A protein has these predicted regions:
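Formylglycine-dependent sulfatase
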Residues: 1-173
Length: 173
């Protein structure tokens, strides 16, 4: 696929998906969270689950939620002191553990696909994970120039990142 938003069904309508192959072999198939970029692009799952109760950015801080409700981008990251399950990836992990136990008890073959959204902008995670690293001990690379030997397609202007409130619209990131 050449674009991030390509549809499996539209681009390759006759392809036998991995999910369909497993179903054809008698497997129970479960999809938890983001497996393909487009939600519900593969129709063959026995069960397809998404934790999205509100916007996909899954902000938890009051300021970011307020900005998003106004149609604005919030900050590129947040680190509130909250439980893992407040974020979608925590919910996904918990649901997948429950599914694994259930599937094991059933004793039949299964294919469980588990998709985590992170690392993806915005870089939101509970404070305890940010506390594992001291910002002062993280060394940035000395050379941030674009390599002449790299393909042009690799060069970009940080477009997605620049949408966020705390990132400059131009210049160094």
């Amino acid at each position: 696929f050449l674009k991030f938003n390509a549809s499996i069904k539209k681009e390759t309508p006759t392809i036998l998906t991995l999910v369909k192959h497993f179903k054809n072999q008698g497997y129970t198939t479960i999809s938890n969270n983001k497996i393909t970029h487009l939600k519900r692009d593969i129709k063959e799952w026995d069960e397809e689950w998404y934790p999205y109760e509100k916007g996909w950015r899954n902000y938890q801080s009051k300021e970011n939620i307020r900005l998003e409700k106004k149609g604005q981008h919030g900050y590129a990251y947040e680190n509130p002191d909250i439980d893992d399950a407040a974020y979608y990836d925590g919910k996904t992990a918990n649901k997948s553990i429950v599914d694994l136990k259930k599937l094991k008890a059933e004793g039949k073959p299964f294919f469980l696909a588990v998709g985590f959204v992170k690392p993806h902008l915005p870089f939101n995670a509970p404070k305890k994970y940010w506390d594992l690293y001291k910002e002062s001990e993280i060394t940035l690379p000395k050379n941030t120039s674009f390599s002449n030997s790299a393909p042009e397609i690799a060069n970009h202007s940080w477009g997605e990142l620049r949408y966020y409130k705390d990132i400059p619209k131009k210049g160094q990131v």
